């Protein structure tokens, strides 16, 4: 299974749940991590790429080839956790491989569609957890507010203490409370260039 830092971070960081949807599941990494963390949960993954779905199934994930826009279109409020490591190369050159292009560009699933359909599928007390480029934080928070989803936990991720944040991990719910909002940071590398203690602790269940 291909393992990427973003997926590992989200899979280790996301809230728990009993019914979970992984949007853009790819190889199934995040779904598998949540299956390990929440062994009693029903975890499903969807992806538009047929090869990715096949790989996720090989990795033990209950995966389906589907667009989020069409997923359970006749049923709402059915998940208590939705997670996604969404496509973010919005301004980069398109990948000549069409499958990978669709998987990594917001043309196939824009941020607003992701938020809108997640809001439709979440239970009243459900949560949406995303990992994004740090520069997308304001945009995604503004979009989420339009659909009555508000941040409950924000972790800004830095490769090194001396560098700007490179990723942000956010959890949203329908509860709008600035008082209860948790904001923290995670530095991935220590001063020697190795994995930081905080990163190791977050992911200790998954890394040898």
In which residue ranges do the predicted regions lie?
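Conserved SAM-binding strand-loop segment of SAM-dependent methyltransferases
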Residues: 60-70
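Conserved SAM-binding loop of SAM-dependent methyltransferases across substrates and taxa
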Residues: 27-40
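Conserved SAM-binding motif I beta-strand of class I
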Residues: 42-47
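Conserved SAM-binding loop
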Residues: 56
């Amino acid at each position: 299974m291909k393992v990427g830092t973003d997926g590992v971070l989200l899979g280790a960081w996301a809230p728990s749940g009993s019914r979970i949807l992984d949007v853009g599941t790819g190889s199934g990494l995040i779904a598998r991590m949540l299956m390990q963390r929440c062994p009693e949960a029903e975890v499903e993954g969807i992806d538009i790429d047929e090869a990715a779905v096949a790989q996720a199934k090989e990795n033990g994930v209950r995966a389906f080839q589907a667009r989020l826009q069409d997923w359970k279109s006749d049923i709402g409020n059915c998940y208590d956790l939705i997670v996604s490591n969404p496509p973010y190369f919005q301004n980069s050159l398109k990948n000549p491989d069409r499958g990978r292009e669709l998987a990594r560009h917001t043309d196939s699933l824009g941020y607003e569609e992701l938020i809108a359909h997640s809001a439709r599928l979440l239970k009243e007390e459900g949560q949406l957890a995303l990992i994004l480029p740090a520069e997308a934080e304001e945009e995604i928070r503004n979009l989420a507010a339009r659909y009555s989803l508000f941040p409950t936990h924000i972790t800004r991720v830095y490769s090194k203490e001396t560098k700007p944040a490179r990723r942000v991990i956010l959890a949203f719910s329908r509860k709008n409370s600035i008082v209860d909002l948790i904001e923290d940071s995670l530095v991935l590398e220590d001063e020697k260039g190795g994995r930081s203690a905080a990163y190791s602790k977050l992911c200790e269940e998954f890394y040898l």
